[in-house]
């Protein structure tokens, strides 16, 4: 084989007039298989070269659009391999041997007495009796049976049809009662949650009023800020947990909450005593312990003994009551405990623990109060997300 040619390049890689669909073999110094020799080193000057007459044909061949290889390519001499698309007729489907295909005849309907037993009640006699009903005749015939007149109002029509056909079919549920039964608890729940959010703002408002008494004429500023806990300036009613004044804010709100609870108890005591619901026997001022009024319900007889003071009334034959006065708060607490014990039977298991807790020394009580003041803020932060669930549980307990 010859080496590189010294004359200008005229090979397939440079002569654009010669089709070169694949673009490789830059110098085309091929082997003697194509009769290349030193006299005709270039492919373009070889008289025995194959001119690739099929290379000018552009079509879908074995190598994709525009790449139709000559000499049949890799897939042979078929028309598809040469890039010629031919349509092959599809073979017809085999004849069906299923004689049952196609529309089948409609099956016979079951008897009416099996599908609609309620319709069997309307026999000819019942139908004629219904037509004789004045309410039905009023739907189609005017008053007096003449062909002129006015038709009954629509509400009479509906009531007549509903009253006549009420004996057949299943009763329709009253959706109005169902909706009202669900709407009531939802309204109570919404009102309870709204009231709770407003009640929770009362201690904060009273705390703001309390702290404003120490800053007359100025803006209240928390005095608990120091170098050990550098925090931004804030109001004493909005101390963060890292502020030293946070525990004092919690103590103020705890006292405010106790005062609000005391006012609510006084109001409830006055209301229940006015309605005669408290198990406390009345005492007339300036008189003896014997009252001439009617006896109220008493939980402990007069001759019985109790470790706590209670109102004991007896009802002798003359109708008088012998009463021992006690604080109304204890009577109210006992009344609430009895009411809750009836509702929740498991509360009776707490009686020994409550009696033991009440019998503790004042030192233990002071220790408990101190622990509540010390750990109360952290417990409040833990339990505060669950506060809105209390009215929800209460509504579920009342309505379920």
UniProtKB/Swiss-Prot annotation:
- Which portions of the sequence form the region Disordered? 1-50, 84-116
- Which domain of life does this protein belong to? Viruses
Lipid link (N-myristoyl glycine) located at?
Answer: 2
**Keywords for this entry?**
Acetylation, Caveolin-mediated endocytosis of virus by host, Fusion of virus membrane with host endosomal membrane, Fusion of virus membrane with host membrane, Glycoprotein, Host-virus interaction, Lipoprotein, Membrane, Myristate, Transmembrane, Transmembrane helix, Viral attachment to host cell, Viral envelope protein, Viral penetration into host cytoplasm, Virion, Virus endocytosis by host, Virus entry into host cell
Report the locations given in the UniProt record: Virion membrane
Record's function text:
The large envelope protein exists in two topological conformations, one which is termed 'external' or Le-HBsAg and the other 'internal' or Li-HBsAg. In its external conformation the protein attaches the virus to cell receptors and thereby initiating infection. This interaction determines the species specificity and liver tropism. This attachment induces virion internalization predominantly through caveolin-mediated endocytosis. The large envelope protein also assures fusion between virion membrane and endosomal membrane. The middle envelope protein plays an important role in the budding of the virion. It is involved in the induction of budding in a nucleocapsid independent way. In this process the majority of envelope proteins bud to form subviral lipoprotein particles of 22 nm of diameter that do not contain a nucleocapsid.
How does this chain assemble?
A: Interacts (via its myristoylated pre-S1 region) with the host SLC10A1/NTCP; this interaction is essential for viral entry.
This chain belongs to which protein, by name? Large envelope protein
- Lineage, highest ranks first: Viruses, Riboviria, Pararnavirae, Artverviricota, Revtraviricetes
